[in-house]
Amino acid sequence: TLEQGHHKTNSAGVIFAMTLDDAPPPQWPASRRRSSRKPEAEPVWITQLKHAADQFLVRRGKGNTVIAGYHWFGDWGRDTMISLPGLCLATKRFAEAASILKTWAQFVSQGMLPNHFPDTGNRPEYNTVDAALWYVHAMDRYDEATGDLKLVRYLWPVLEDMIGWHLRGTRYHIHADPTDGLLHAGEPGMAVTWMDAKIGDRVVTPRIGKPVEINALWINALRVMDVLVSQEIAVPAHDYIKLAERATTSFERYWNPDTGC
């Protein structure tokens, strides 16, 4: 007999149940019902979000990563770093967050994080300007949530390598402009921001130059580095606050009084 709100399919001895109610279906084993029982003080919707988040946390070799979406997306650098605070830190999965940060650090090349890992197992692609900047942001969120200075010190060389390459220049003409400190990115035929759609060889949204959100991330990354330095992580290779302030001044130089931006 089915209760209201449930749908059951019995095939080869496997029972599937669906419900919007918080209580697990009565057909579930008692051990599963016990393991899924939420803390008394936790709202139902928080528990549901935690369960939904589980499906995106997966393994890559011996480490952890995040699947950008099912069924055809793999793990993407930008998506992984943007989602890490919500998937791992808000849910107190600190060990998995640390594993994700360490896993991706292994694939940093010329200061850049992979855009994504091809499903065919080929070499990762590095055609993104913001994945590395989101990595620095995720590292900052992890530091604030955990106070785990051991991991921060371990990954500090990676962070400095990222910033150093962006200052000197890396793939796709990504470099800090020496005249204003802002980050320039892009070259013909390449789409390196999140607006990365292409039709054949044609870039749908060409954004060669200094995209606004990229430079917001760049300034944030420089300020994060200064915050980490203040925790006596290591002797810095650059004066990060000076770099951040210069870029900030340049960022605010243009103001449109008609639009207020």
Residue spans for each PLM region:
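Acidic, mature catalytic/reactive cores of soluble proteins
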Residues: T1-C261
